[in-house]
């Protein structure tokens, strides 16, 4: 049995399923009045894609004998799986089709980049070099990828907040309903837009939606930040074990520190300064781009310890 062929076919199937799910979610949002239950099809498709990704990662782990995070291809698959897992949890809690409409396209692009851009050789498992044969590898890289997945999602909600608010300062203290499920808020907003001629009613629904986006972005970023912190610390221990230095100002390390500072500033401004709305959404939105520079951008430089086994 050629596991490489099976894994490749499964990964391509994931791409097709995610493309289908994205189409379903966008149709469901575009024709909200007539397709209220259509998003369930998209959610089921995402669950199937997530199960397939779990199978791919699990089979690579069993066949190769090590945790499948040793190269760029495997990390992209793991990131896709992480994003889908977090999205499914949030959708289960909120019953919101909006979450799927913005997260599925990102997961699709990541999976497409892994399958359509990387060469066949880069997609194959290969024996680990001595520096990577460490238990710290699983902790460091898995924590970093979990942090990327959660922080990307939280950042996307921040960007969505800025788009819906049209980059305006919105007073979110007017309402005291931040704990409302996002699903109910989506219903308020879209039904007001579709059925009510009153601008006052539609603006109330919009305000509720913005309040919920602000609340959920804060929760998700608050979840991802500890993962990032643990990942950086574990990476330092691993580096000292492998190369005799906790920190070498490698480009990846530098950008990981920048990413940590951006999200630490976001959380600090919310917890101690009481910021919310536009100000924190800008910080969170900035974090989205910083994450991608840290994760992929510095790999194209071909410099530093992290360029080995990824993209050089």
Swiss-Prot record:
It is found in: Plastid, Chloroplast thylakoid membrane. GO terms for cellular component: chloroplast thylakoid membrane; plasma membrane. Keywords: Chloroplast, Cytochrome c-type biogenesis, Membrane, Plastid, Thylakoid, Transmembrane, Transmembrane helix. The chain crosses the membrane at residues 12-32, 47-67, 72-92, 98-118, 144-164, 220-240, 254-271, 281-301. It is a multi-pass membrane protein. GO terms for molecular function: heme binding. The keyword Cell cycle does not apply. It comes from the Eukaryota. Pfam families: Cytochrom_C_asm. The keyword GTP-binding does not apply. GO terms for biological process: cytochrome complex assembly. Belongs to the CcmF/CycK/Ccl1/NrfE/CcsA family. May interact with Ccs1. Required during biogenesis of c-type cytochromes (cytochrome c6 and cytochrome f) at the step of heme attachment. PANTHER family: CYTOCHROME B_B6 PROTEIN-RELATED (PTHR30071:SF1), HEME EXPORTER PROTEIN C (PTHR30071). This is Cytochrome c biogenesis protein CcsA. The lineage of its organism: Eukaryota, Sar, Stramenopiles, Ochrophyta, Bacillariophyta.
